[in-house]
């Protein structure tokens, strides 16, 4: 049975336009709320036969939609009916703005938990649209919104991961390490052990890619999420 889905705002509303931000936001909140309600209405049974709401993760796309995605995520989860529901969101570390986005999400999660709400989850990815963002910004004469080399992207990933795994942060915003890089995975594993936050960490990979990695992680009882298109 399905217990976890990942969606994008363009997948639930195709008429997004920067010229009508408030309308886009209101429509997306309405549609994301409907998905959250169904996730709660049709729970799954975990390994101990407890019923739990299905998990919904809000993915990121182009840089131009990042602010809208963040605002929709926070506004929807601020609705009273979702106070006790846990949902996730992606942060792309190929964006220099990723640090400020993470800061915003951590502040939101801390306030939410302090007021009696459920914890949330942040899925750290490096980003899949680096070439497209670079070409698009060049064609339009805009400043490039992404780092232009892999070293900076990788360093930013570890920088955000360091802060995400701090005990006070990890307890209110769990972490999904989305990577097939052995160094990144080992780094996250060892750092989570040092901070004693292993229960707040999951490793997320694509089904069928580097199959030895999930096998090894499973052998040492790590939480693993495998993504596959449906």
Give the positions of each predicted feature.
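Positively charged, amphipathic and often flexible ligand-engagement surfaces
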Residues: 1-230
């Amino acid at each position: 049975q399905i217990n976890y889905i990942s969606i994008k705002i363009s997948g639930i509303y195709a008429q997004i336009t920067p010229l009508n931000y408030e309308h886009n936001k209101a429509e997306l909140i309405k549609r994301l709320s409907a998905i959250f309600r169904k996730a709660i209405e049709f729970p799954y049974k975990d390994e101990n036969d407890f019923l739990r709401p299905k998990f919904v993760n809000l993915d990121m796309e182009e840089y131009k939609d990042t602010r809208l995605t963040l605002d929709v995520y926070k506004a929807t989860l601020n609705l009273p009916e979702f106070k006790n529901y846990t949902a996730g969101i992606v942060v792309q570390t190929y964006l220099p703005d990723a640090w400020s986005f993470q800061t915003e999400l951590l502040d939101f999660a801390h306030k939410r938990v302090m007021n009696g709400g459920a914890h949330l989850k942040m899925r750290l990815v490096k980003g899949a649209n680096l070439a497209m963002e670079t070409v698009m910004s060049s064609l339009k004469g805009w400043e490039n919104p992404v780092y232009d080399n892999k070293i900076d992207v990788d360093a930013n990933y570890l920088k955000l991961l360091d802060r995400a795994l701090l005990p006070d942060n990890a307890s209110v915003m769990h972490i999904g390490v989305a990577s097939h890089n052995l160094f990144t995975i080992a780094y996250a594993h060892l750092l989570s052990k040092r901070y004693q936050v292993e229960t707040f960490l999951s490793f997320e990979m694509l089904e069928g890619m580097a199959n030895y990695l999930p096998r090894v992680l499973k052998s040492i009882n790590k939480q693993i999420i495998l993504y596959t298109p449906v």
